[in-house]
UniProtKB/Swiss-Prot annotation:
GO biological process per UniProt: catabolic process
Role, per record: Transcriptional activator for the pcpA, pcpB and pcpE genes for pentachlorophenol (PCP) degradation. Essential for PCP degradation.
Cross-referenced InterPro entries: LysR-type_TF, LysR_subst-bd, Tscrpt_reg_HTH_LysR, WH-like_DNA-bd_sf, WH_DNA-bd_sf
Keywords: Activator, Aromatic hydrocarbons catabolism, DNA-binding, Transcription, Transcription regulation
Protein name as catalogued: PCP degradation transcriptional activation protein
Organism expressing this protein natively: Sphingobium chlorophenolicum
DNA-binding interval(s): 23-42
PANTHER family cross-referenced by the UniProt entry: HTH-TYPE TRANSCRIPTIONAL REGULATOR LEUO-RELATED (PTHR30118), TRANSCRIPTIONAL REGULATORY PROTEIN (PTHR30118:SF15)
Length: 307
């Protein structure tokens, strides 16, 4: 007998022949061409140095060695089906998996409310943890699986990271409804003279870093009243003070719909953001990761989430 390890498919051929007693029926049960089954049976015979199944008037009868091996082979296949193959499937209706999504505070505010309806309807036990987006360890976290999906606007990430573009985002200005600039208009000179709050690009190499650099280049230093690392905090400050905030348009609409901020076009040209979801190639075929990516891709990002 050969000591080499048999592929699982060969063991399944053995099991099907034992159960059905017919090469034709076994091939049909396995959805494989009969010539392939015959070839694998020949390899099994060579491996065991035994005919294994002998053609008789009543069908393919097992040899004594095959009869002794059959229960053990059936047990191995059952273990595979029960434990291994079940891990290769993902059933959102019964899964209690906790997915970790890395995004900025704005990204989490944009995505998580939209995920809620899908989770309630199709994945009642699935949980989602939103974590802060940090470029430094992001690739390592995606590779290790500690982060399932990242959501944001990175121009480039290292090899091994797969992406899907979700939407393109433009920048606008927001200010509170009693802001003096609303009376006089917001041309470039007025924009430079107003007080500003700037969100810093704490996510290194994020597209927002280019926007921050452009604003710092254009605005007099004394006009920058606040800097923060948080979009939502900055928007709250803009609601309460006479500062102008330059932010992505979807976040601006989110606050404007609540009545606290007024939207104005930016009087300078700024780069837009191509917002994508990111995952590591190690998990490209992971059923749970595939399900989450499909759910995210179907989310309607064009409008604010329902109140």
């Amino acid at each position: 007998m050969n000591d080499s390890v048999l592929p699982l498919g060969h063991l399944m051929v053995f099991d099907a022949l034992y159960r059905h007693g017919s090469a034709g029926k076994a091939a049909h049960a396995l959805s494989m061409p009969q010539p392939t089954l015959s070839r694998w049976l020949a390899q099994l015979r060579t491996h065991f140095d035994d005919p294994l199944f002998v053609r008789t008037r009543s069908g393919m009868e097992p040899t004594p060695l095959a009869a002794r091996a059959a229960p053990h082979i059936a047990e191995m296949i059952a273990i595979y089906r029960q434990h291994v193959r079940s891990e290769l499937r993902f059933d959102p209706g019964t899964s209690n998996r906790n997915f970790r999504i890395a995004a900025s505070d704005f990204g989490q505010a944009l995505m998580l409310p939209r995920l809620y309806a899908t989770l309630e309807e199709t994945a009642p036990q699935v949980r989602v943890t939103g974590v802060n987006l940090r470029h430094g360890p992001l690739v390592e976290e995606l590779e290790s699986g500690s982060i399932d999906i990242a959501f944001g606007g990175f121009p480039t990430l290292s090899a091994g990271i797969k992406t899907q573009t979700l939407f393109r985002e433009e920048y606008v200005c927001v200010m509170r409804q009693s802001h003096p600039a609303l009376t006089h208009g917001l041309d470039l000179e007025a924009f430079r003279q107003c007080r500003h709050i700037i969100v810093t690009a704490h996510e290194f190499n994020h597209v927002h870093e280019q926007v921050e650099a452009r604003l710092l280049e254009l605005l007099p230093p004394e006009s920058i009243r606040f800097t923060t690392e948080n979009f939502l905090v900055s928007a709250v400050i803009a609601e309460e003070t006479d500062v102008i905030l330059t932010i992505p348009s979807r976040l601006a609409r989110w606050f404007a719909n609540r009545g606290g901020l007024t939207i104005f076009p930016v009087p300078i040209e700024l780069p837009s953001i191509e917002v994508k979801q990111y995952w590591h190639e190690r998990y490209d075929k992971d059923p749970g990761n595939i399900w989450l990516r499909r759910v995210i891709a179907k989310i309607g990002f064009q409008n604010p989430p329902a109140e």
